[in-house]
Amino acid sequence: MSSGPKYMRYLLFAAVGLAVFFLISRSSIPIPENIGSKLSPANYKDTISQSDKAHNDAPPKPPVKETPGSANTAPVGRVNATFVTLARNSDVWDIAKSIRQVEDRFNRNYHYDWVFLNDKPFDDTFKKVTTSLVSGKTFYGEIPKEHWSYPDWIDQEKAKKVREEMGQKKIIYGDSESYRHMCRYESGFFFRHPLMLNYEYYWRVEPSIELYCDISFDPFKLMKEQNKKYSFVLSLYEYYDTIPSLWDSVKKFMGNHPEHIAEGNAMGFLSDDGGKTYNKCHFWSNFEIGSLEWLRSKQYLDYFDALDHDGGFFYERWGDAPVHSIAAGIMLKKEEIHFFNEIAYYHIPFTHCPTSEQMRLDLKCHCNPSENFDWKGYSCTSRWFQINDMEKPEGAEEQS
């Protein structure tokens, strides 16, 4: 009699097993035979498998058209801004180095867009290499011919003779025609390119630059929140033989447009005698973060148009650095121009490296502070600190 309960348990287990088998056999959710292949990482690329796509009769929705500076490219909390680079196809590997510097030190955390501009169409290699390196969206634009050619009022024979004379004098880029077109374009047109029109701020990046320190904040956000219009990391004196008549053109502009000259401006950075002469100080424009809205303003466009018609981009060799610097110095208030001491930077042959040892350690810098250019005799950064009554950073006096 003691075996009765045992048999009852066996019968109960058998009944439960039959019930489970019956439910599984009647289920409308079949177990996939190829479950192993479905779990392959290769299938994660598409949210819809190829077999599912074949059975989807509905036409696919068109992709959202992304335009530079649109809501599609500016996540919440990020400023409407872009990096911008003027480059040739042959610059691809040099600009690749620059992109890695910018991405590793800053943009991998922010994913800002990058606009590339060229007077010729970009080739596939340039596009593939740069797109693969930039964490944000990339855009490629061709410069309109009218922005990279001689305006009607320029005597091209006279311009050619000037290039030949400067070449004989061994003035750097003095005999270069393309360099003059580049300087004119950077001075008056890059911010008018259709790809740039929807952005508010830009950060200019050139081939073969280095960023020596981590950038632990968003410079674009600082510019916007503190109402800065222009910024720099290096400043120096311009080569006078390239700009002998530039200040005369500037003074003529100031006389014709006093409404464009700001009170509390940075004239003291540009001139030692209240504007009578130019001391040749300028911000080095191969690094600059600035306001595109300011460059597109009437005051700046009037300024560029006046200089452009005077012909110095071609009859001399006016650079975009003094052109931008003078504009900022006379048309902006001093507090609207910012010095980024924290952004350690190199462009041949000059280095900006923070003098504070603690800052270099905190920002994981790898620059040699003895190579810092800021406080050397040919730099104008001391003058910038002086006119703003700013205290020089720790360690600066040791390098003076």
From Swiss-Prot:
SUPFAM superfamilies hit by this protein: Nucleotide-diphospho-sugar transferases
Catalytic residues identified in the record: 288
Enzyme class, spelled out: transferase
InterPro entries: Glyco_trans_15, Nucleotide-diphossugar_trans
Cofactors demanded by this protein: Mn(2+)
Annotated GO CC locations: Golgi apparatus; Golgi membrane
Cytoplasmic compartment segments: 1-6
GO biological process: asexual sporulation resulting in formation of a cellular spore; cell wall mannoprotein biosynthetic process; fungal-type cell wall organization; protein N-linked glycosylation; protein O-linked glycosylation
Activity across pH: Optimum pH is 7.0.
Membrane-spanning segments: 7-29
Pfam families attached to this UniProt entry: Glyco_transf_15 (PF01793)
Reported temperature dependence: Optimum temperature is 40 to 50 degrees Celsius.
Keyword terms: Glycoprotein, Glycosyltransferase, Golgi apparatus, Membrane, Signal-anchor, Transferase, Transmembrane, Transmembrane helix
Compartmental location: Golgi apparatus membrane
Regions of this protein lying in the Lumenal compartment: 30-400
Disruption phenotype: Results in thinner hyphal cell walls and shows increased sensitivity to cell wall stress such as exposure to calcofluor white and Congo red. Results in an unstable cell wall at elevated temperatures (over 37 degrees Celsius). Shows an increased sensitivity to azole antifungals and attenuated virulence in a murine infection model. Does not affect cell growth, conidiation, conidial morphology, conidium survival, conidial germination, nor the adhesion of conidia to host epithelial cells.
Glycosylation sites: 80
Superkingdom of this protein's organism: Eukaryota
Function: Alpha-1,2-mannosyltransferase involved in the elongation of N-glycans and synthesis of the second mannose residue of O-glycans. Catalyzes the transfer of mannose to mannose and alpha-(1,2)-mannobiose as substrates but hardly transfers mannose to alpha-(1,3)-mannobiose or alpha-(1,6)-mannobiose. Transfers the C1-hydroxyl group of the mannose residue from GDP-mannose by dehydration-condensation with the C2-hydroxyl group of the terminal mannose residue. Required for the maintenance of the fungal cell wall and full virulence, but not for the adhesion of conidia to host epithelial cells.
Annotated protein name in UniProt: Alpha-1,2-mannosyltransferase 1
Organism: Aspergillus fumigatus (strain ATCC MYA-4609 / CBS 101355 / FGSC A1100 / Af293) (Neosartorya fumigata)
Upper taxonomic lineage: Eukaryota, Fungi, Dikarya, Ascomycota, Pezizomycotina
